[in-house]
UniProtKB/Swiss-Prot annotation:
Source taxon at top rank: Archaea
Gene3D superfamilies for this protein: Spore Coat Polysaccharide Biosynthesis Protein SpsA, Chain A (3.90.550.10)
Any Gene Ontology biological process: protein N-linked glycosylation
Organism: Methanocaldococcus jannaschii (strain ATCC 43067 / DSM 2661 / JAL-1 / JCM 10045 / NBRC 100440)
Name the UniProt record assigns to this protein: Uncharacterized protein MJ1222
Pfam family, one: Glycos_transf_2
Length: 243
């Protein structure tokens, strides 16, 4: 019985050397060092930081942490940064590619939560949802909750799966899924989060959501989407659908 338990735990063991973490960053000198240190403490050594035209010391701090740094001369937006980072990670042929926000809102321990469905349950993509845990949901400001639900619905209407947190920055892709999605990716800005889900459905990829925790700070709350960004996402998704 003990031998069987040991064998099962070995089968479900995550080899973190086969995982690449992509961290898009724009003017993140305040948090990028801590974010990278925390990821490395959890055993994630293969990290790609995409400095999306920052005007501060984001690149210098990331380089000191010994990670791969790709730098855009001009700011291209979240979609542009993620596209560059995923393409870079694909060159190393990892089993799993993770996207992870630079602003400190994600727990590095939650990376395993999105990895497991892809590695062990036959899913092609997993999203860490801030909306599945009722306690976490209470911590999210009402405006963000309403905006998130609206964008979830829009993502579904535009041809994607209906998910609880379409705008989450914590995701896992299998190598094959990332290759399929990156070949069709058009978004340069925040609409990329919805486009990932739309393309997942287009390619018939199996997607799972898992609950994650979020670290809400004054700093992390100042980043990400707002009402104006939400309308921009809607407009760009409609344009992509038409053209």
């Amino acid at each position: 019985m003990e031998i069987m338990k040991k064998q099962n735990s070995q089968i479900n063991e995550i080899n973190k050397d086969e995982i690449f973490v992509v961290v898009p960053a724009f003017n993140e000198e305040k948090m990028i060092g801590e974010t990278l240190k925390n990821l490395k403490k959890e055993g994630y050594k293969n990290i790609v930081v995409v400095d999306d035209g920052s005007m501060d010391k984001t690149s210098e701090i990331a380089k000191k942490e010994g990670v791969i740094v790709c730098r855009h001369i001009l700011n291209r937006g979240l979609g542009g940064a993620l596209g560059t980072g995923i393409k870079c990670a694909l060159l190393y042929k990892p089993k799993i590619i993770i996207t992870f926000d630079a602003d400190g809102q994600h727990h590095p321990k939650d990376v395993e939560k999105v990895v497991k469905p892809v590695l062990f349950e036959g899913y092609d993509m997993a999203i860490g949802s801030r909306m599945m845990d009722k306690n976490e949901l209470k911590n999210m400001p009402l405006v963000k909750r309403i905006g998130n639900f609206g964008l979830n619905f829009i993502t579904y209407l535009m041809g994607g799966y209906f998910v609880t947190d379409s705008q989450s920055g914590l995701r896992a892709f299998s190598y094959e899924a990332a290759k399929k999605i990156i070949g069709d990716l058009k978004s340069d800005r925040y609409e990329v989060s919805s486009e990932f889900i739309i393309l997942a459905k287009k390619h018939g990829l199996k997607l799972k959501e898992v609950p994650i925790k979020t670290i809400y700070t004054e700093y992390s709350m100042s980043r990400g989407t707002n009402v104006i960004t939400g309308f921009k996402i809607l407009f760009k998704l409609i344009m992509q659908k038409i053209f």
